[in-house]
Amino acid sequence: MSSSSATSGVVGDRGVPCKCVCGLSVTVFTSKSQDNSGRPFFRCISKRDAKTWTNNRNGHLFKWVEEAVFEEVEDALPRLAVIANEINKAKSEALELKAMIQEILEEALINKMQIRRNWCGLKLGFVWLFVITIVIVYVLFGQDNEKKLVAGY
C-alpha cells in the first residue's frame, strides 16, 4: 500500500466516507504493507481483493482512517464553538430571566402588602360608617319620646 492520503475521485469529501464515487459503499481494511502495516483505511468495496489494488486507484475511494477522523474533528470544532456560544447565551438569558422573576416576586410582595393595608383601611372605614349611622339614628330617633321630628319647625 502506498502511504498517499489523497481521496481519489472524491473532490471535496471530508471526514469519514460512506460511499465511493462509483456509488458502492465503503468499508475499512487494514494495510498489510511494510510501510503502513496495521494501518486502517477506507476503500471502495469493489476493490475487496487486495491483488487488484494498485497505486492507480481507478477513480475509487481510498482514505486513511486517521485522516478521516482528523477531518471530522476539524469540521466539528467550529460547530462546537457555535454550540458553546449558544450555551453561554442561554446561560446569560437564564440569569436575566431569574433577575426578572426576582423583581416580579418583589413587586408582588409589595402589592400584597399594599392590598392588606388598603383592606384594613376599608374595614376601618366601614366600622366608622356603621358607628356614625348608629349615632345619627340614635340622635334622630332615640332621644325623648316628647321630641319628635316636626316638618317645618
From Swiss-Prot:
GO terms for molecular function: zinc ion binding. Residues 1-43 form a transit peptide. A zinc finger (GRF-type) spans 20-68. InterPro entries: Znf_GRF (IPR010666). Coiled coil: none annotated. Keywords: Chloroplast, Membrane, Metal-binding, Plastid, Transit peptide, Transmembrane, Transmembrane helix, Zinc, Zinc-finger. It is a single-pass membrane protein. This is Uncharacterized protein At1g43920, Chloroplastic.
